[in-house]
Amino acid sequence: MEQGIGKKAQIVCITSGGKVLEMAKQHSFQFIEIPGGKPPRACLGYSFVHLVKVLGAYGLAPSSLFKELDNTIDLLYKENLNIKKLEVEVAKTLHKKIAVLYSLGTCEGVAVRIRQQINENSKMLCWHNTFPEMNHNELVGWTTKNDDLVVISLQTTFDYERTKKRYEVCKPLFEKYSHAVIDLHAKGNSKLEQFFYLINIGDWVSVILADLKGIDPVEVKIIDHLKGELAKMG
Protein backbone atom coordinates (compact mmCIF):
# COMPACT_ATOMS: atom_id res chain seq x y z
CA MET A 1 0.00 0.00 0.00
CA GLU A 2 2.83 2.37 0.84
CA GLN A 3 4.30 1.84 -2.63
CA GLY A 4 0.90 2.57 -4.18
CA ILE A 5 0.61 5.76 -2.16
CA GLY A 6 4.09 6.77 -3.27
CA LYS A 7 3.10 6.32 -6.91
CA LYS A 8 -0.18 8.19 -6.37
CA ALA A 9 -2.14 5.13 -7.48
CA GLN A 10 -5.89 4.87 -7.09
CA ILE A 11 -6.28 2.51 -4.15
CA VAL A 12 -9.26 0.42 -3.04
CA CYS A 13 -8.79 -1.76 0.05
CA ILE A 14 -10.42 -5.09 0.85
CA THR A 15 -9.64 -5.75 4.49
CA SER A 16 -10.87 -7.32 7.71
CA GLY A 17 -9.32 -4.52 9.75
CA GLY A 18 -5.94 -3.82 11.26
CA LYS A 19 -3.26 -1.62 9.72
CA VAL A 20 -4.77 -1.71 6.22
CA LEU A 21 -8.13 -0.39 7.40
CA GLU A 22 -6.37 2.22 9.53
CA MET A 23 -4.37 3.47 6.54
CA ALA A 24 -7.43 3.42 4.27
CA LYS A 25 -9.31 5.69 6.66
CA GLN A 26 -6.27 7.88 7.22
CA HIS A 27 -5.85 8.52 3.47
CA SER A 28 -9.61 8.53 2.68
CA PHE A 29 -9.29 5.52 0.37
CA GLN A 30 -12.35 3.54 -0.64
CA PHE A 31 -12.47 0.29 1.29
CA ILE A 32 -14.58 -2.83 1.72
CA GLU A 33 -14.51 -4.30 5.20
CA ILE A 34 -15.04 -8.05 5.41
CA PRO A 35 -15.68 -10.08 8.60
CA GLY A 36 -12.60 -10.49 10.78
CA GLY A 37 -11.48 -13.04 13.32
CA LYS A 38 -10.68 -15.73 10.75
CA PRO A 39 -7.45 -16.67 8.97
CA PRO A 40 -7.24 -15.27 5.41
CA ARG A 41 -7.32 -18.79 3.95
CA ALA A 42 -10.83 -19.21 5.38
CA CYS A 43 -12.11 -16.02 3.73
CA LEU A 44 -11.53 -16.79 0.06
CA GLY A 45 -15.21 -16.31 -0.76
CA TYR A 46 -15.32 -12.85 0.80
CA SER A 47 -12.05 -11.65 -0.71
CA PHE A 48 -12.57 -13.10 -4.20
CA VAL A 49 -16.13 -11.85 -4.71
CA HIS A 50 -15.25 -8.34 -3.56
CA LEU A 51 -12.12 -8.35 -5.71
CA VAL A 52 -14.22 -9.20 -8.76
CA LYS A 53 -16.66 -6.41 -7.88
CA VAL A 54 -13.85 -3.87 -7.58
CA LEU A 55 -12.22 -4.95 -10.83
CA GLY A 56 -15.61 -4.85 -12.54
CA ALA A 57 -16.25 -1.32 -11.30
CA TYR A 58 -13.02 -0.20 -12.97
CA GLY A 59 -13.72 -2.10 -16.18
CA LEU A 60 -10.95 -4.60 -15.49
CA ALA A 61 -13.17 -7.69 -15.28
CA PRO A 62 -15.66 -8.83 -17.94
CA SER A 63 -19.33 -8.56 -17.04
CA SER A 64 -19.69 -12.28 -17.82
CA LEU A 65 -17.63 -13.03 -14.71
CA PHE A 66 -20.54 -11.99 -12.47
CA LYS A 67 -22.81 -14.53 -14.16
CA GLU A 68 -20.10 -17.14 -13.72
CA LEU A 69 -20.01 -16.33 -10.01
CA ASP A 70 -23.76 -16.93 -9.76
CA ASN A 71 -23.40 -20.18 -11.68
CA THR A 72 -20.56 -21.25 -9.39
CA ILE A 73 -22.72 -20.74 -6.31
CA ASP A 74 -25.57 -22.69 -7.93
CA LEU A 75 -23.20 -25.52 -8.86
CA LEU A 76 -21.81 -25.88 -5.34
CA TYR A 77 -25.31 -25.93 -3.85
CA LYS A 78 -26.46 -28.48 -6.42
CA GLU A 79 -23.43 -30.74 -5.92
CA ASN A 80 -23.28 -30.29 -2.14
CA LEU A 81 -24.25 -33.82 -1.13
CA ASN A 82 -22.08 -35.45 -3.79
CA ILE A 83 -19.12 -33.27 -2.81
CA LYS A 84 -19.55 -34.14 0.89
CA LYS A 85 -19.45 -37.84 0.10
CA LEU A 86 -16.38 -37.41 -2.10
CA GLU A 87 -14.57 -35.27 0.50
CA VAL A 88 -14.90 -37.98 3.15
CA GLU A 89 -13.66 -40.69 0.76
CA VAL A 90 -10.63 -38.64 -0.26
CA ALA A 91 -9.80 -37.66 3.33
CA LYS A 92 -9.97 -41.26 4.55
CA THR A 93 -7.63 -42.35 1.76
CA LEU A 94 -5.22 -39.51 2.59
CA HIS A 95 -5.24 -40.09 6.37
CA LYS A 96 -1.69 -40.79 7.58
CA LYS A 97 -0.40 -40.46 4.01
CA ILE A 98 1.32 -37.74 1.96
CA ALA A 99 -0.63 -36.17 -0.88
CA VAL A 100 1.03 -35.65 -4.25
CA LEU A 101 -1.09 -33.20 -6.24
CA TYR A 102 -0.82 -33.07 -10.01
CA SER A 103 -2.52 -30.39 -12.08
CA LEU A 104 -2.96 -31.20 -15.74
CA GLY A 105 -1.80 -27.71 -16.63
CA THR A 106 -4.92 -25.57 -16.37
CA CYS A 107 -5.39 -25.25 -12.63
CA GLU A 108 -1.98 -25.07 -10.98
CA GLY A 109 -3.27 -22.27 -8.76
CA VAL A 110 -5.90 -24.67 -7.41
CA ALA A 111 -3.20 -27.24 -6.68
CA VAL A 112 -1.23 -24.61 -4.74
CA ARG A 113 -4.35 -23.69 -2.77
CA ILE A 114 -5.10 -27.31 -1.85
CA ARG A 115 -1.46 -27.97 -0.91
CA GLN A 116 -1.43 -24.98 1.39
CA GLN A 117 -4.75 -25.97 2.97
CA ILE A 118 -3.43 -29.45 3.71
CA ASN A 119 -0.22 -27.92 5.10
CA GLU A 120 -1.98 -25.46 7.41
CA ASN A 121 -5.33 -27.04 8.26
CA SER A 122 -4.25 -30.69 8.33
CA LYS A 123 -0.68 -30.02 9.58
CA MET A 124 0.59 -32.45 6.92
CA LEU A 125 3.32 -32.43 4.32
CA CYS A 126 2.13 -32.28 0.72
CA TRP A 127 3.62 -31.36 -2.62
CA HIS A 128 2.30 -30.39 -6.03
CA ASN A 129 3.51 -30.27 -9.60
CA THR A 130 2.03 -29.86 -13.05
CA PHE A 131 1.84 -31.76 -16.30
CA PRO A 132 3.78 -31.66 -18.55
CA GLU A 133 6.47 -30.04 -16.34
CA MET A 134 6.82 -33.05 -14.03
CA ASN A 135 7.56 -35.23 -17.07
CA HIS A 136 10.92 -33.47 -17.46
CA ASN A 137 12.27 -34.20 -13.99
CA GLU A 138 10.03 -35.47 -11.18
CA LEU A 139 8.86 -38.46 -13.22
CA VAL A 140 12.30 -40.04 -12.80
CA GLY A 141 11.66 -40.19 -9.05
CA TRP A 142 8.86 -42.70 -9.55
CA THR A 143 11.06 -45.78 -9.48
CA THR A 144 10.39 -47.35 -6.07
CA LYS A 145 7.31 -48.27 -4.08
CA ASN A 146 6.28 -45.76 -1.42
CA ASP A 147 3.08 -46.72 0.36
CA ASP A 148 3.02 -43.35 2.15
CA LEU A 149 2.12 -41.49 -1.06
CA VAL A 150 -1.33 -40.83 -2.51
CA VAL A 151 -1.47 -39.23 -5.94
CA ILE A 152 -4.35 -36.85 -6.64
CA SER A 153 -4.86 -35.52 -10.15
CA LEU A 154 -6.84 -32.30 -10.63
CA GLN A 155 -8.55 -32.41 -14.00
CA THR A 156 -10.74 -29.91 -15.87
CA THR A 157 -12.41 -29.94 -19.26
CA PHE A 158 -10.04 -27.12 -20.25
CA ASP A 159 -6.92 -29.30 -20.04
CA TYR A 160 -5.13 -29.95 -23.33
CA GLU A 161 -5.82 -33.36 -24.86
CA ARG A 162 -2.13 -34.11 -25.27
CA THR A 163 -1.55 -33.30 -21.59
CA LYS A 164 -4.35 -35.69 -20.64
CA LYS A 165 -2.66 -38.40 -22.70
CA ARG A 166 0.61 -37.74 -20.90
CA TYR A 167 -1.13 -38.29 -17.58
CA GLU A 168 -2.81 -41.49 -18.75
CA VAL A 169 0.59 -42.86 -19.81
CA CYS A 170 2.05 -42.03 -16.38
CA LYS A 171 -0.92 -43.15 -14.28
CA PRO A 172 -0.02 -46.89 -14.23
CA LEU A 173 3.39 -45.88 -12.86
CA PHE A 174 1.76 -43.91 -10.05
CA GLU A 175 -0.58 -46.80 -9.29
CA LYS A 176 2.38 -49.19 -9.11
CA TYR A 177 4.55 -47.08 -6.82
CA SER A 178 2.06 -45.27 -4.56
CA HIS A 179 -0.63 -46.26 -2.07
CA ALA A 180 -3.47 -45.00 -4.26
CA VAL A 181 -4.36 -42.71 -7.16
CA ILE A 182 -7.40 -40.42 -7.02
CA ASP A 183 -8.64 -38.56 -10.09
CA LEU A 184 -10.72 -35.48 -9.26
CA HIS A 185 -12.72 -34.37 -12.29
CA ALA A 186 -14.04 -30.82 -12.00
CA LYS A 187 -17.69 -30.10 -12.72
CA GLY A 188 -19.16 -26.94 -14.21
CA ASN A 189 -19.10 -25.11 -17.52
CA SER A 190 -16.64 -22.28 -16.91
CA LYS A 191 -13.12 -22.28 -15.52
CA LEU A 192 -14.38 -20.38 -12.49
CA GLU A 193 -17.00 -23.03 -11.72
CA GLN A 194 -14.54 -25.87 -12.17
CA PHE A 195 -11.78 -24.22 -10.14
CA PHE A 196 -14.07 -23.47 -7.20
CA TYR A 197 -15.53 -26.98 -7.40
CA LEU A 198 -12.03 -28.41 -6.86
CA ILE A 199 -11.15 -25.78 -4.25
CA ASN A 200 -14.30 -26.65 -2.30
CA ILE A 201 -13.31 -30.31 -2.25
CA GLY A 202 -9.74 -29.54 -1.25
CA ASP A 203 -10.71 -27.14 1.53
CA TRP A 204 -13.07 -29.59 3.17
CA VAL A 205 -10.70 -32.53 2.74
CA SER A 206 -8.10 -30.57 4.70
CA VAL A 207 -10.57 -29.88 7.52
CA ILE A 208 -11.77 -33.50 7.64
CA LEU A 209 -8.14 -34.64 7.83
CA ALA A 210 -7.64 -32.35 10.82
CA ASP A 211 -10.70 -33.89 12.46
CA LEU A 212 -9.40 -37.41 11.79
CA LYS A 213 -6.14 -36.41 13.49
CA GLY A 214 -7.96 -34.74 16.38
CA ILE A 215 -6.26 -31.37 15.83
CA ASP A 216 -7.34 -27.74 15.43
CA PRO A 217 -7.34 -26.76 11.73
CA VAL A 218 -7.12 -23.05 12.56
CA GLU A 219 -4.01 -22.79 14.74
CA VAL A 220 -0.61 -22.27 13.11
CA LYS A 221 1.59 -22.14 16.22
CA ILE A 222 4.76 -23.03 14.38
CA ILE A 223 4.35 -20.04 12.04
CA ASP A 224 3.63 -17.81 15.04
CA HIS A 225 6.82 -19.13 16.64
CA LEU A 226 8.82 -18.34 13.50
CA LYS A 227 7.45 -14.79 13.36
CA GLY A 228 8.27 -14.31 17.03
CA GLU A 229 11.86 -15.48 16.58
CA LEU A 230 12.34 -13.28 13.51
CA ALA A 231 10.92 -10.30 15.41
CA LYS A 232 13.61 -10.78 18.07
CA MET A 233 16.26 -10.41 15.38
CA GLY A 234 14.89 -7.01 14.41
Segments from the language model and where they lie:
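Hydrophobic/aromatic beta-strand patches that form the interior of the parallel beta-sheet core
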Residues: 12-14, 30-32, 100-102, 127, ...
